[in-house]
């Protein structure tokens, strides 16, 4: 298990991009993952770091509740994006062109390239994920795999 306290200390005052899977683990209270995510979520809530994500995360998060017509979950997810909790990046031309470059040069899946590009264009120092491909292939940002912090 990695040193959570040291990582949180390094992230203080920084912009941290949350990949979709981190928010899924928290919203779904996913066993074996949520405990590794909550300290980062708490740090954003306490204002010790700035939590960021991309608009595409909203689309990814809404798929499951839309399939099941779960209005409560849809409302909860939308409120996360409507409030001041996370800074949400639009996917503009600059970030999409960078995503294409990352896809072409680093072999990332397009969705992962879009997330990574949004984080880079949004001046995030860290990207928090549990996606092995991003962890192994993304360059241009420090990728932090929450798997290192699981109990």
Residue ranges: model-predicted function:
Residues 20, 55, 112-116:
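Conserved glycosyltransferase catalytic-site signature
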């Amino acid at each position: 298990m990695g040193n959570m306290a040291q990582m949180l200390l390094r992230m203080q005052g920084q912009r941290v991009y949350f990949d979709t899977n981190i928010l899924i683990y928290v919203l779904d209270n996913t066993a074996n993952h949520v405990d590794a995510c909550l300290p980062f979520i708490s740090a954003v809530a306490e204002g010790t770091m700035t939590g960021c994500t991309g608009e595409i995360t909203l689309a990814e998060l809404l798929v499951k509740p839309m399939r099941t017509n779960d209005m409560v979950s849809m409302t909860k997810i939308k409120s996360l994006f409507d409030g001041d909790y996370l800074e949400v990046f639009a996917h503009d031309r600059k970030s999409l062109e960078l995503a294409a470059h990352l896809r072409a040069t680093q072999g990332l899946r397009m969705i992962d390239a879009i997330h990574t590009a949004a984080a880079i264009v949004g001046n995030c120092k860290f990207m928090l994920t549990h996606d092995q491909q991003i962890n192994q292939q993304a360059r241009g940002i420090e990728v932090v795999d929450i798997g290192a912090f699981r109990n």
